[in-house]
Amino acid sequence: MSLPGLDLTQPSAEREFAPAPPSQITLSAGSEWRFEVAFGTTVRVKLISGTAELFGTELAPSQTYTFCGTKSAIYTWHGCELEVGAGDAISALEATGMNGAATAQGFGAGGCQSEYTAEETPMVEYANVHFALETMRQEAKATGKDGPRVLILGPEDAGKTSLSKILTAYATKIGRQPIVVNLDPAEGMLSVPGTLTATAFRTMMDIEEGWGSSPMSGPSAVPVKLPLVYFYPMQNPLEGDGSVYRSIVSRLALSVMGRMAEDEDSRETGIIVDTPGVLSQSKAGSLEMINHIVTEFSITTILVIGSERLYSTMMKNYDNKPTSSASAVASDERISVVKLSKSGGCVDRDAAFMKHVRESQIRTYFFGNPIPSTASAALSVSASSTTNVTLSPHAQQLDFNSLGLYNYNITSTEEDEDEYDPAQFGASDAFLPGGANDAEQGASQQDENPSATPLPGIVSSIESAVPSGASNVPLKKLLPPAPSALANSLLAITHVPPTATPSEIRDSSIMGFLYVADVDSEKGKIRVLAPVGGRVPPRAIVWGKRWPGEVVGLVG
């Protein structure tokens, strides 16, 4: 009982968690609204009047867009008015899959964790870069040369991917078809983490999903993209002296250049290459890796964001130097280095947030997008108020002995040395003298007896079954029993047969991914989720043990 005139009663659950009414946000010309939304909650944004864009892609008037787990900014060139409100909460299944992600709504408009209006933005600089690239494209069309090949460099969380989206969106808006290359294995572009991808963009990008979506069996309001995917199951490009990453980059560049030679629109538009921030940290081998990328993609323009030191180094090494293009001598094609300002909206994304991003990308690959989207519903034939793309992966049990499963055997100081897996120890293992490991013992035995051959039916690693010229590829074939560490990890299916050489497996593009739900080491069976039905094709499979690593909670 409360005193008269004082409302001291306990608030009900409905009253406590009732969503706040939508807020009206007015932006003046040349300003942007920056917002952060936690995983597990959604925020709806509607353009009431004026014009606005998110990373270069225009918002449709009177359409409601739903955002979840993002840090973004909506910019306006001429002024606009936005309506921001709280969206529907994600179901308990998706929320538990976030593994402890922050799901509490913030105190900003619509439940944003953080939101504010900024008057100072680098959008004018970015627009000038777009116009300069467009001038180069017009010259390429007139002279028959290749279009600009742009490399974006900068430290972590400097806005490199955001700039890539802006330049791509502006190019597609005027009918161009740029090829976008993602060289950052930490985040997937139209794919899962741990991949290097290249995609030709002819149509608009998705406001809610960033780059958009790749082909799937469900409906899509925005035209899907067709990515070329290579698997690099490590977080750092410089792992193992960078030899694996360097080889995959070369193969990806060869495919991109082949596409440009056959596609006139892509050749005139050029390419945009997004890079990982670790290459800008002055670590051993980083400058050599940048030089490898510049050479392989015949880069003509280097954009440096948020690093004076890196900009100075790039100016000394590349500015006004001839490109590696075959036509550079005849056309006097030279490299330009440009410094760009870092946006004040760039915020640090901690390890916990990036883990949620990776888990969300993997979950979306197998189960679709759980976020209800009214924008997609408005473009669909049905009259439902909200819609979400729900996919149903196919579960099946595989015989481990029938799989050609490989793993990259690269030592790392960051790897957990205390990891213990009893399934890895079999009858052939022994306690080696002096603390030597299997690799050291095997190497010493080969030195003593180079002509020694393994026993029939026993292959210790893939290197012993291939010519010596390919033995430098650190791929090792997994032998029975099935390691229990396979559970809750990804498997990448390549396009080459299981008997392919290590270099062929490393350089092969990816057909699709499997998720290992359970491992039965005693019976030699593994239970997997596949995006399509039918038998798993007899192809070489690469284990993503180290990256993206273990993904717990994807299935019950």
From Swiss-Prot:
Q: What species is given as this protein's source?
A: Aspergillus terreus (strain NIH 2624 / FGSC A1156)
Coiled-coil region(s): none
Which superkingdom does the taxonomy of this entry point to? Eukaryota
Describe, as the record does, how this protein assembles with itself and its partners.
Answer: Component of a pre-mRNA cleavage factor complex. Interacts directly with PCF11.
What protein is this chain from? mRNA cleavage and polyadenylation factor clp1
Keywords, A to Z, come to: ATP-binding, mRNA processing, Nucleotide-binding, Nucleus
Q: Where in the cell is it found?
A: Nucleus
Could you say which residues bind ATP here? 32, 71, 157-162
Primary gene name: clp1
What's a single GO CC term here?
mRNA cleavage factor complex
General function of this protein: Required for endonucleolytic cleavage during polyadenylation-dependent pre-mRNA 3'-end formation.
Q: Where is the composition biased (Polar residues)?
A: 442-452
Spell out the Pfam families in the cross-references. Answer: Clp1 (PF06807), CLP1_N (PF16573), CLP1_P (PF16575)
